[in-house]
Amino acid sequence: MFVIIGWAVSMACIFGVFIAHGGNISVILHALPWEMITIFGAAIGAFLANNQMKVVKATGRGLGLCFKGSKYSKARYMELLALMYDILQKARKEGLMSIEKDVEDPHSSPLFQKYPTVGNDHHVTEFITDYLRMMVSGNLNAHEIESLMDSEIETHHQEEHAAVAALQRLAGGLPAFGIVAAVLGVVNTMGSVGQPPAVLGGMIGSALVGTFLGILLAYGFAEPLAGLLEQKVEDAGKEFQCIKTTLLASMQGYAPQVAIEFGRKVLFSGDRPSFSELEGHVKKK
């Protein structure tokens, strides 16, 4: 929603001021279709040549996320931490083996079904159950599991950030393709040098639209989307860090209510529930 609003504000300011100062918008509209095909088509072709198919697909998914509201909120994190509390509390009271069935089949587990917002998220559920399974097996100590968690989180970050980098490269190339379109327009204009000045002026104006569009598409559209997607990637990584910190605190002997406090402190301040909010939510559940 805010992406559309941001674009609308940018376009209104740019073209509104241009028209207010007596600019002829018809010149831009006349040149727009062919210049867009040249610039955008060349940029998409370069994008496909520059990225593996998995990155292209990840970029497509990422662009879809940019037009949706963030799923990461205080309410989601309270559910996540309440789930972690229930799991760790059960393991503390009944032993680690008591959560084995929950770990092996989380979709049928009453614990995970109790918190559908988190329990229905495949990536989060898999991350939690993978490391709970290692804790149940008892083959790895806290330092070894922490190292493994760090490696997985880093891999996840690299995979998600590949789409961000691809969009940033696309944004970097758009002004250059705008110049290419402008140069081609100038070449056409030079072939018509015998035309009256009014005709030549229109042709030169159309050629300059290419440079304008390249810069506008880069810094008005592609670069903001890359920045927004990067923020969403950071939000996703923060959730995994919260899980990691909570589980490691539990492995180091802290009680469940203290372990989830470790996890709470990792969250960004805007999404972090207060101590009393989390305590009340856990007790209510």
Where are these regions (language model features)?
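Membrane-spanning helices that line or support transport/gating and their immediate boundary helices
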Residues: 55, 59-62, 203, 220-232, ...
